[in-house]
From Swiss-Prot:
Protein task: NDH-1 shuttles electrons from NADH, via FMN and iron-sulfur (Fe-S) centers, to quinones in the respiratory chain. The immediate electron acceptor for the enzyme in this species is believed to be ubiquinone. Couples the redox reaction to proton translocation (for every two electrons transferred, four hydrogen ions are translocated across the cytoplasmic membrane), and thus conserves the redox energy in a proton gradient.
Family per record: Belongs to the complex I 49 kDa subunit family.
Protein name listed in UniProt: NADH-quinone oxidoreductase subunit D
Example GO molecular function: NAD binding
Subunit structure: NDH-1 is composed of 14 different subunits. Subunits NuoB, C, D, E, F, and G constitute the peripheral sector of the complex.
Keyword Cell inner membrane part of the UniProt annotation: yes
Length: 417
């Protein structure tokens, strides 16, 4: 009788559940995975090398394009690393704005993850629900930066501009009549803070809707409970961070353990899982959305009553405002020098990490005293998570590999860099 051998299956890179350009070479015994070999590099754009030939400010928009679902969180780590080397103090109002937008970014990321993960596992309506809320969050991005995705809003020394006092309005068009437009503009009558406050008030009920659809759903539980189990010790050894580590029962969060900006003043909890499977990681991320909502509310309340500058007054690092630039020769020179030559960073090295929605996102900069980094190293959270793909999917069915990829929340912009 002929010997029955394992066969090889290529999963991706064109597969819709591959979350980008993942190529998995699966060794299968029937439908059971014996080995999973992830092939990466299909979205490699040499970001680290490009940064060596650009000034510090010119490299900032590259950060948005790493994890292109959590744009401002990438910028945050980059700015913190530069500020460490420069020794620049960030105004307190700018710190609150940064924290608020970092948490808005966390909501954007987790909503994208929840919609895509649900879709991968067969819960198609989740994507529609989640994108409904993402649309509102993108409007917040657009209000401060003019861009809905690649904002480039955080700058070394603060943020690009203060929060606007008015929101853009929808106008009557061929698709919607005046009544529909009035309904859309109902929460856009005040400032951006009013708009955010309105969203924060409604959001907990919307999260309840997601939980109604999934948390006790029998099919969802069958697809996620007991799949991709990782023990706390193994999660640490594999280099897991963020929800992947907390889902295994390890309460590690940089916002609590190594607070940066104004996180030390914020009141929030760290959701932690028990069993370390896909279902636990789902519960952790949903609970994180509720905590992010709490943080945003605290920032909104503080920003309402406290005014002040939003970027450092050191014009060798941050540009002067337009009014003074047009009337003062010295300010014009500062502006010109900053956007042609850039600022020179003192010799040294610095590592700054933030609690990115996916885990610990770190930027390591080595400076030789020039206006460009000598070396820039990006520490993406998804890289070490994807490395555990083989271990997490071994012994499971092909359909479970989709659930494992979904629970990792991987984006190839940051993995391939």
């Amino acid at each position: 009788m002929a010997e029955i051998k394992n066969y090889t299956l290529n999963f991706g890179p064109q597969h819709p559940a591959a979350h980008g350009v993942l190529r998995l070479v699966l060794e299968l015994d029937g439908e059971v995975i014996q080995r999973a070999d992830p092939h990466i590099g299909l979205l490699h754009r040499a970001t680290e090398k490009l940064a060596e030939s650009k000034t510090y400010i010119q490299s900032l928009p590259y950060m948005d394009r790493l994890d292109y679902v959590s744009m401002m969180s990438n910028e945050h780590a980059y700015c913190l690393a530069i500020e460490k080397l420069l020794g620049v103090d960030v105004p307190i109002r700018a710190q609150y704005i940064r924290v608020m937008f970092s948490e808005i970014t966390r909501l954007l990321n987790h909503l994208m993850w929840l919609g895509a993960h649900g879709l991968d596992c067969g819960a198609m309506n989740m994507l529609i629900y989640c994108f409904r809320e993402r649309e509102v969050l993108f409007d917040m991005y657009e209000a401060v930066s003019g861009a809905r995705m690649h904002a480039a809003y955080f700058r070394p020394g603060g943020v690009y501009r203060d929060l606007p006092e008015s929101m853009s309005q929808y106008k009557v068009n061929k698709i919607r009549n005046a009544k529909a437009i009035d309904a859309l503009n109902e929460n856009r009558q005040g400032s951006l803070l009013d708009f955010i406050d309105d969203f924060v008030t409604k959001f907990p009920k919307l999260v309840d809707e997601y939980e109604t659809l999934l948390t006790d759903n029998r099919i969802w539980k069958q697809r996620t409970v007991g799949v991709g189990v990782v023990s706390p010790e193994r999660a640490l050894n594999l280099g897991f961070t963020g929800p992947m580590l907390r889902g295994s029962g390890f309460a590690w969060d940089l916002r609590k353990q190594q607070p940066y900006e104004v996180y030390a003043q914020m009141d929030f909890d760290i959701p932690v899982g028990k069993t370390g499977d896909c279902y636990d990681r789902y519960l952790v991320r949903v609970a994180e959305m509720r905590q992010s909502n709490r943080i945003i509310k605290q920032c909104v309340d503080w920003l309402r009553v406290n005014s002040g500058p939003v970027i450092t007054s050191n014009h060798k690092v941050a540009p002067p405002n337009r009014e003074s630039m047009k009337s003062n020769m010295e300010e014009l020179i500062h502006h010109f020098k900053l956007f042609t030559e850039g600022f020179h960073v003192p010799e040294g090295e610095a590592y700054a990490a933030v609690e990115h929605p996916k885990g610990e996102f770190g930027i390591y900069i080595v400076s030789d005293g020039a206006n460009k980094p000598y070396r820039l190293k990006i520490r993406p959270p998804g890289f070490s998570h994807l490395a555990a793909m083989d271990e997490m999917s071994r012994g499971h069915m092909i359909a479970d590999a989709v659930a494992v990829i979904g629970t990792m929340d991987i984006v190839f912009g940051e993995i391939d860099r």
